[in-house]
Amino acid sequence: RSTESYKNLIVSENNELKVIKPFGPTIARVKMPNELIKNLNDYVDEILSDEDKSKKLDHGSKLAGSVTQEFKLEKEFIDSSGYKSFLSKSVIEWLKISGYGKVDEFKIISSWIVRQFKNEYNPIHWHGGHVSGVGYLKVPDSFGETPQPLTNKSNKNGNLELVYGSRQFLSDSSFSIKPETGYFYFFPHYMMHAVYPFTGTDEERRSISFNALIDEKSFYVYGN
């Protein structure tokens, strides 16, 4: 499946947040406020202009990707920019709509920026913590063409691919997301995912990711 069919997969809606259930676990899709997108991009550009700070915050050695640059966000910025509040409110609403009741705690473990350019990729992997997600701060106007003409398959250049379980009768095992500037996707930490390379442009695909903990009462709802 792909984001083109997400409207058919919505479990419930509340304003801009949509809870999507393409397979076992639910995921959530929410539009970031424009002010937050600007704050995050301004912060990234500020870090990029400071070589010493870029080196200090470098996170590339800790992550799976073959990409140009990955660096951590500073806690002070996470707390003061509205980003932490956005994540907390979105996760709480997602889990409530998904039937998991009230979440009493939300603690960010880490958050980082990924700067990806043509021919770069992120291999299949998963995260730590309890909940994770990715949002898009900049995307190219085009992700390039495929070498062979496509028939009934969509162009997945630059896509985020979520993977869960195995493909069986009446059971899809993957969900492909075409990045759009300003949209954030939330998923459980164990959700395997990969990012495909793109071609045909020198523009940046800039994303932001996080790992967080919620209270154990909510996370271990089915026991430890």
Question: What role is predicted for each listed range?
Answer:
Residues 207:
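A domain-level signal for the structural core that forms small-molecule/cofactor-binding pockets
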Residues 3-101, 112, 119-122:
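Non-heme Fe(II)/2-oxoglutarate
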